[in-house]
């Protein structure tokens, strides 16, 4: 059974920083590109970041580029999202995805 468990969320003031984690299990983590997406208070789904299977390549929409950093630890089956210079429009529920 594939499981993706996010942690690290919370309330942050504008301009603040936050790091999210995602613990993956039930599949060979290192074989997959991984993603962060978010659901806004208006229930709109937005893509936030993508990282390649080996972690060498990362992709972001312009809305978060330069502020968010996706990374991964294939030895620990963990995915991360470092968010900085947070804005009110970043308010959302964040999810990792395979």
UniProtKB/Swiss-Prot annotation:
Sequence ranges assigned to domain Ig-like in this UniProt record: 1-98
tRNA-binding recorded as keyword: no
GO cellular component, one term: extracellular region
GO biological process: immunoglobulin mediated immune response
Species of provenance: Mus musculus
Protein name per Swiss-Prot or TrEMBL: Ig heavy chain V region 6.96
Domain of life: Eukaryota
GO MF entry, a single one: antigen binding
Keyword 4Fe-4S among UniProt keywords: no
Misc note: This sequence belongs to the VH7183 subfamily.
Keyword tags: Adaptive immunity, Immunity, Immunoglobulin
């Amino acid at each position: 059974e594939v499981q993706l468990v996010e942690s690290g969320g919370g309330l942050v003031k504008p301009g603040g920083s936050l790091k999210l984690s995602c613990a993956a299990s039930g599949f060979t983590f290192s074989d997959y590109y991984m993603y962060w997406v978010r659901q806004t208070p208006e229930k709109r789904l937005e893509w936030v970041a993508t990282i390649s299977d080996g972690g060498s390549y990362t992709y972001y929409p312009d809305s978060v580029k330069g502020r968010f950093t996706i990374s991964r630890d294939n030895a620990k089956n963990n995915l991360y999202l470092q968010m900085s210079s947070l804005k009110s429009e970043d308010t959302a529920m964040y999810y990792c995805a395979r």
